[in-house]
Amino acid sequence: MENDTVSEMNQTELQPQAAVALEYQVVTILLVVIICGLGIVGNIMVVLVVMRTKHMRTPTNCYLVSLAVADLMVLVAAGLPNITDSIYGSWVYGYVGCLCITYLQYLGINASSCSITAFTIERYIAICHPIKAQFLCTFSRAKKIIIFVWAFTSIYCMLWFFLLDLNISTYKNAVVVSCGYKISRNYYSPIYLMDFGVFYVVPMILATVLYGFIARILFLNPIPSDPKENSKMWKNDSIHQNKNLNLNATNRCFNSTVSSRKQVTKMLAVVVILFALLWMPYRTLVVVNSFLSSPFQENWFLLFCRICIYLNSAINPVIYNLMSQKFRAAFRKLCNCKQKPTEKAANYSVALNYSVIKESDRFSTELEDITVTDTYVSTTKVSFDDTCLASEN
């Protein structure tokens, strides 16, 4: 979501210092290389998996690709330059690099924030308004929204081209070059505060409210409430399965439903909580420094704040993608990992409006893959292996 802080932090690091402790340099380089390296690989895999696998091109995955690209920008533009900063103690990318790298930092963070907001709204519509979702949550609409998100953030972040410049400080034994600002802190502080509100506070409030509605649906609506829908699903089940249902299997299915829905809700809570916590130190620092005459610039705390941001960008593939069976299978296929032969994949998946729809339908989302045992069990359906499955062969 944001890097208003990242740019300021890079400037903070480059403030005149007699020397940077060797242990600080080593820790910085080690952490940045590991976290950013793994994050870059993970986000690239997300993009490749969705682009190369036809059945993965869903509206939800479209937002995940946008988020992965934004996280790549954050990791590359905001993370990797810290290595050269730690080694040389000075800005080595020149004036053009100062403009472009800072621009990409802000673009990646703000686009990440907007992508998460768009994804949150899409999840809310898909789960809480499944009828509307069939024409609102489409692949073509998702692409248009993403184009708008990137166009908006690209234009918005251009203001930094007019605020940045190289600052040169001369000392006895060295000349330190920093990527800084042309204007006083009193002028750019309002910009940071605006970014804090637009790209952090508002998305977090919106996510909290919408995920609250999602949790209410998942917890308080364990079975379909429409008798006609129940009757229709029962008739469809009777064609393909035994008419005599076992009560024990029904209980197992119900327990599986409750457990699955709790798991989904936990995942949604983790998404919100991690995003809020990992961005909070950096955002809080920016807000506090905006009101201080002399900004707080302790190196180790600044490093902690940056590492939190890099972790947020690196961990997103784990949170959003590795909880999906389809993504795991696509990852293994991409890595050419050998898999045991399995039964043919089901041709149908269960939507959260308790109706069965084809996977090729435009309203196909990844959350349904996560909750494959979550919605259809209310009809006491028994699969061929005596477990609760939400698909038909």
Swiss-Prot record:
Electron transport in keyword set: no
Sorted UniProt keywords: Cell membrane, Disulfide bond, G-protein coupled receptor, Glycoprotein, Membrane, Receptor, Transducer, Transmembrane, Transmembrane helix
Localization in the cell: Cell membrane
Signal peptide start-end: none
Pfam families: 7tm_1
Family matches, as InterPro entries: GPCR_Rhodpsn, GPCR_Rhodpsn_7TM, TRH_rcpt_1
One CC-aspect GO term: plasma membrane
Cross-referenced SUPFAM superfamilies: Family A G protein-coupled receptor-like (SSF81321)
Residue spans, topological domain Cytoplasmic: 52-61, 122-144, 216-266, 320-393
GO molecular function, one term: thyrotropin-releasing hormone receptor activity
Xref: SMART domains: 7TM_GPCR_Srsx (SM01381)
Disulfide bonding pattern of the chain: C98-C179
Extracellular side: 1-28, 84-99, 169-193, 289-296
Chain segments annotated as transmembrane: 29-51, 62-83, 100-121, 145-168, 194-215, 267-288, 297-319
Mode of membrane association: Multi-pass membrane protein
Transmembrane helix keyword on record: yes
Glycan-bearing residues: N3, N10
Domain of life of the native organism: Eukaryota
Family statement drawn from the similarity comment of this UniProt entry: Belongs to the G-protein coupled receptor 1 family.
Its job: Receptor for thyrotropin-releasing hormone (TRH). Upon ligand binding, this G-protein-coupled receptor triggers activation of the phosphatidylinositol (IP3)-calcium-protein kinase C (PKC) pathway.
Protein name: Thyrotropin-releasing hormone receptor
